[in-house]
Structure formats: C-alpha cells, structure tokens
Amino acid sequence: MTRDELHAAAMALPGAHMDVQWGDDHVYKVAGKMFAATDGAYSNLSFKATDIAFEALTEAGRGRPAPYMARAKWVVLDDLAAQDAAEVADWVRTAH
C-alpha cells in the first residue's frame, strides 16, 4: 500500500481527519479518537484491530503488537509498501 492509498482510504471514512503528532507521526482520528497512525515516511502502520485480526496478524508474523497499545489490540505492520492495499484499507475501515 502506498502513502496516497492509505491517506485516501483513511480520509474517505466518515468524520475522519489526520493530525501530525509526536514529531512527525500522522495520526488518523474520528471524534478525537485514534484509529490508525503511521510515521511521517508512511513506512509502517499501526491500527486498532479486532480480536481475531490481532491474533491472526501477530501469530502469522505479518504484524506485531504495537508498543504501549498492544493491550488495546493495536497492531503494527512494519512494511506498509509490501501490504495489499485492499486488505489494509479494510483493516483501517474496521478500526474506524
């Protein structure tokens, strides 16, 4: 998934906006709550996953528990460019 594809998918969701926080992180929010975040280079993506997606992604090694956020079932995908755009867009929609 490219930077533009991620940004378009996240911003297409109702009420979504993006803030730059913590230096250069791009944080996608709705109603003041985060649902996805990426570094400024869009090299990785963190998002709130369902219980099933969290288990599947982390157990298969496709993602890892997000630092400080794993208890809330956040996942990090370390290589966003290698991810299928449609699949990531679906995870972002679900996180929203």
Regions found by a protein language model. Give the residues of each.
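Charge-dense, helix-prone N-terminal extensions
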Residues: M1-H96
